[in-house]
């Protein structure tokens, strides 16, 4: 009895000239290898491998052999591209990650490097997809590379990515600084008055410390200034005048006191202090006179 997992169909159009013996091929099925020798088959007929699980394929294999005696060929697979060559190949059945209920498996055919020179025209990798006869949706051929790992980045790429990240960080910081500058209130520029404007303003301030609205408008028009500029200048000038006036008043009061002392007219607040000083001076002079008199009397007594 043949293996339940495999069945080979012979094409009715096979000729005796295209027969080539196949060598023993190794089959790797989920870590289990079986070596089987196949009889001579026609290259025009397509060799098929139906992959499945024992619980699904046992029934399928028995039905297939029974139907083979009554019917010639019900399902015909596509022919291989090279029909006139003998292939010595290893069939590898990759371990599928699909659940047992899945009925389709991908088979990848990789020709050996030691084959005949005519195999150079054949593609390097032939992929075929076999599915169970019960499935109604055909599937395409797909071969996935074994190496799914990511390639390591070169130092140049790492440096380039780090440089782009630093540039993005610097641009973000610059944008933040610009936003903070925009949000902050701009500082007003200080008005620079000319000498002629200052002279006119000083002359007006000497006559009037406070301006009326009409007079302020006239001065602003004459001096080519705004009313706000004239108003602010007069406010600052009044504050300065008050500070100078306070200092001048103190200096004038001190000068006046000195003049009064020189003239002999003292202020009532200074009389008490000056009187006490004069009395102290007179007392000292009297004490000195008494001491002198006592000295003279003692000298006369010794004589």
UniProtKB/Swiss-Prot annotation:
Main location: nucleus
Bias type Polar residues, positions: 86-100
Biased composition (Low complexity): 111-136
UniProt-annotated location(s): Nucleus; Nucleus speckle
Stretches with biased composition (Basic residues): 63-81
Gene induction: Rapidly and transiently down-regulated during the transition from G0 to G1 induced by mitogen stimulation.
Feature: compositional bias, Basic and acidic residues: 157-170, 182-191, 289-303
Database matches in InterPro entries: HD, HD_metazoa, Homeobox_CS, Homeodomain-like_sf, MOX-1/MOX-2
DNA-binding region: 186-245
GO annotations of cellular component type: cytoplasm; nuclear speck; nucleus
Tissue expression: Aorta and heart. Also detected in lung and kidney.
Keywords: Activator, Developmental protein, DNA-binding, Homeobox, Nucleus, Transcription, Transcription regulation
One Gene Ontology molecular-function label: RNA polymerase II cis-regulatory region sequence-specific DNA binding
Biological-process GO terms, alphabetical: angiogenesis; fibroblast proliferation; limb development; myofibroblast differentiation; negative regulation of cell migration involved in sprouting angiogenesis; positive regulation of transcription by RNA polymerase II; regulation of transcription by RNA polymerase II; roof of mouth development
Domain remark from Swiss-Prot or TrEMBL: The polyhistidine repeat may act as a targeting signal to nuclear speckles.
Subunit comment: Interacts with RNF10. Interacts with TCF15.
Protein name in UniProt: Homeobox protein MOX-2
Taxonomic path: Eukaryota, Metazoa, Chordata, Craniata, Vertebrata
């Amino acid at each position: 009895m043949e293996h339940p997992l495999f069945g080979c169909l012979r094409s009715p159009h096979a000729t005796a000239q295209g027969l080539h013996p196949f060598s023993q091929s190794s089959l790797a099925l989920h870590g289990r290898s079986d070596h089987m020798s196949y009889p001579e088959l026609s290259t025009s007929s397509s060799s098929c491998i139906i992959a499945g699980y024992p619980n699904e394929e046992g029934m399928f294999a028995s039905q297939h052999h029974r139907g083979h005696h009554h019917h010639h060929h019900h399902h015909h697979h596509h022919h291989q591209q090279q029909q006139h060559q003998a292939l010595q190949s290893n069939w590898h059945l990759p371990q599928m990650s699909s659940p047992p209920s899945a009925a389709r498996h991908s088979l990848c055919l990789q020709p050996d490097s030691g084959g005949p020179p005519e195999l150079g025209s054949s593609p390097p990798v032939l992929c075929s997809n076999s599915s169970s006869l019960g499935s109604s949706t055909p599937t395409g051929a797909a071969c996935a590379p074994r190496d799914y790992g990511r390639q390591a980045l070169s130092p140049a790429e790492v440096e380039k990515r780090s440089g782009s990240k630093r540039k993005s960080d610097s641009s973000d910081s610059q944008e933040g600084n610009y936003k903070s500058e925009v949000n902050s209130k701009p500082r007003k520029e200080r008005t620079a008055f000319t000498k002629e404007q200052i002279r006119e303003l000083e002359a007006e301030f000497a006559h009037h410390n406070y301006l009326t609205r009409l007079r302020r408008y006239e001065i602003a028009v004459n001096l080519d200034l705004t009313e706000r500029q004239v108003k602010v200048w007069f406010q600052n000038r009044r504050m300065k005048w008050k500070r100078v006036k306070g200092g001048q008043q103190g200096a004038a009061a001190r000068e006046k006191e000195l003049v009064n002392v020189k003239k002999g007219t003292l202020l009532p607040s200074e009389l008490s202090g000056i009187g006490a000083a004069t009395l102290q001076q007179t007392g000292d002079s009297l004490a000195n006179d008494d001491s002198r008199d006592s000295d003279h009397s003692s000298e006369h007594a010794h004589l």
